[in-house]
Regions:
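Metal-dependent nuclease catalytic cores that hydrolyze phosphodiester bonds in DNA/RNA
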Residues: 1-113, 215
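Acidic active-site catalytic centers that drive phospho-/nucleotidyl reactions
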Residues: 104, 117, 131
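Short, charged, amphipathic alpha-helix that recurs within catalytic cores of restriction-modification
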Residues: 128-141
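Metal-dependent nuclease catalytic regions and adjoining charged, substrate-binding loops involved
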Residues: 2-6, 11-12, 83-98, 123, ...
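Short small-residue beta-strand/loop micro-motif enriched in glycine and branched aliphatics
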Residues: 114-117, 162-163
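Short beta-strand-loop-alpha-helix junction that forms the active-site gateway
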Residues: 118-125
Length: 215
């Protein structure tokens, strides 16, 4: 497991980036080739542009940010006063599940918390749902809010939410299953599954080096 990009070890426990859930949702074998086997291929134009846009949005928010407060303070104050608060680029970590990442936006409302992940499209693919659900799980474990949590996917460009669901038992069980499977990949106690969809293989940037490609 040494040298795996993005993997951090805290008190002997592996922690991997929550964004890996998105990759696993597309193709677990792709995740395995990139992160575990450390096979390098060029980034796509979409990936490069997406990273630039994300950095610009983060910079814009930081320039406009006015009042600083902790999550705990925002949760307490919203309950007491009925105010709502918006937090961008919130770093989160779950020591229980061994995951970490940065949440695009957290909306703290008097009766609920909304965890938002910004994406370039409008389709709620399973990998995206699992990624934002993992952010919700990590937030729940770290801050233990006294209200319901909702997971939401939002179009990065027009700011319209195209998927929104209460973080319930079904989402929790679904994402925990994938988290445990990734930890098993890291520990080399299970072999990854590959996609059976040729269309995914055609879109995959690893198709020329993948020994399971159907393209």
């Amino acid at each position: 497991m040494n040298g795996i990009d993005g993997l951090i070890v805290i008190n002997g426990i592996n922690h991997f980036p929550i964004s890996w859930l998105h990759s696993k949702g597309f193709c677990e074998y792709q995740l395995y080739l990139e992160k575990i086997k450390k096979i390098k291929v060029e980034k796509t134009t979409e990936m490069i542009i997406g990273k630039q846009i994300h950095a610009e949005l983060e910079k814009e928010f930081l320039e406009q940010a006015e009042e600083e407060m902790t999550i705990e303070e925002a949760l307490s104050r919203s309950k007491e006063t009925g105010e709502s608060f918006l937090i961008r680029e919130l770093e989160t970590i779950s020591r229980k599940y061994g995951i970490y990442g940065k949440i695009d936006e957290v909306q703290i409302l008097p009766e609920s918390v909304v965890i938002i992940d910004d994406k370039p499209g409008n389709v709620a693919y399973q990998g995206l749902i699992k990624q934002v659900s993992a952010y919700s799980l990590s937030f729940l474990e770290e801050f233990k809010p006294d209200r319901e949590i909702f997971s939401a996917l939002r179009n990065r460009d027009n700011k319209e939410v195209f998927w929104n669901q209460k973080f319930d038992k079904n989402l929790l069980e679904m994402v925990v299953k994938d988290i445990l499977e990734i930890h098993d990949l890291i520990r080399d106690v299970r072999f990854p599954e590959s996609s059976t969809n040729p269309q995914k293989c055609l879109k995959c940037r690893f198709r020329k080096v993948c020994d399971r490609s159907l393209a």
